Amino acid sequence: MSFVSKLLYTVSALVLFHSGFSSYEFHHLLKLNSLNNAQGAISKLPKDIMYETYAGLILFVLAVFTSFEKLQYLPIESNDGKIISQGNYLKEIALNKATNVDNLIGSNPNGEIIFTPSFVDVHMKRKICREWASNTVKKEK
């Protein structure tokens, strides 16, 4: 977190605290005034307190956005011994470059998805096993 974001957090907290205290004072004075005066002419929060609250919220949002640190991207294959920790992200891989080797050697990079047991034709496998079993029984006789 940078110095600017810490400063903005502090200023926004002070401004919001002051606007909250001013609002409390206003409502307390309004309550005392309504006990003494039955008409109670002022019931709305003054605009300066509202503007102070909005300014504090805007400063807080700016502090949040300035507190983000620059992301550090790390390559997948690195020999410098860096360990990926929180806040560090791997660089994106261009899929067309990643699959060139797989295409040249004829392997399927999605093999673990395509060749799962749930996609195997069980009836065909049983038929092949029956034919193999019947052929081995015939050879033994």
From Swiss-Prot:
Family per similarity comment: Belongs to the membrane magnesium transporter (TC 1.A.67) family.
Another remark in the UniProt entry says: Present with 5240 molecules/cell in log phase SD medium.
Ranges of the Cytoplasmic topological domain: 1-6, 70-141
An example GO CC term for this entry is: endoplasmic reticulum
Q: What is the first-listed, main subcellular location in coarse terms?
A: endoplasmic reticulum
> How does it associate, per the subunit comment?
Component of the ER membrane protein complex (EMC), which is composed of EMC1, EMC2, EMC3, EMC4, EMC5 and EMC6.
Q: Where are the transmembrane segments?
A: 7-27, 49-69
Q: Quote the InterPro entries the UniProt record gives.
A: EMC_subunit, MMgT
Role: Part of the endoplasmic reticulum membrane protein complex (EMC) that enables the energy-independent insertion into endoplasmic reticulum membranes of newly synthesized membrane proteins. Preferentially accommodates proteins with transmembrane domains that are weakly hydrophobic or contain destabilizing features such as charged and aromatic residues. Involved in the cotranslational insertion of multi-pass membrane proteins in which stop-transfer membrane-anchor sequences become ER membrane spanning helices.
Segments in the Lumenal topological domain? 28-48
Question: What's its membrane topology?
Answer: Multi-pass membrane protein
- Look up keyword Transmembrane helix and say if it applies: yes
Q: What is this protein called?
A: ER membrane protein complex subunit 5
Where does the protein end up? Endoplasmic reticulum membrane
Q: Which UniProt keywords apply?
A: Endoplasmic reticulum, Membrane, Transmembrane, Transmembrane helix
Gene Ontology BP annotations: phospholipid metabolic process; phospholipid transport; protein folding in endoplasmic reticulum; protein insertion into ER membrane by stop-transfer membrane-anchor sequence
Where would one find coiled-coil regions in this protein? none
Q: Which organism is it from?
A: Saccharomyces cerevisiae (strain ATCC 204508 / S288c)
> Which Pfam family name is an example for this entry?
MMgT
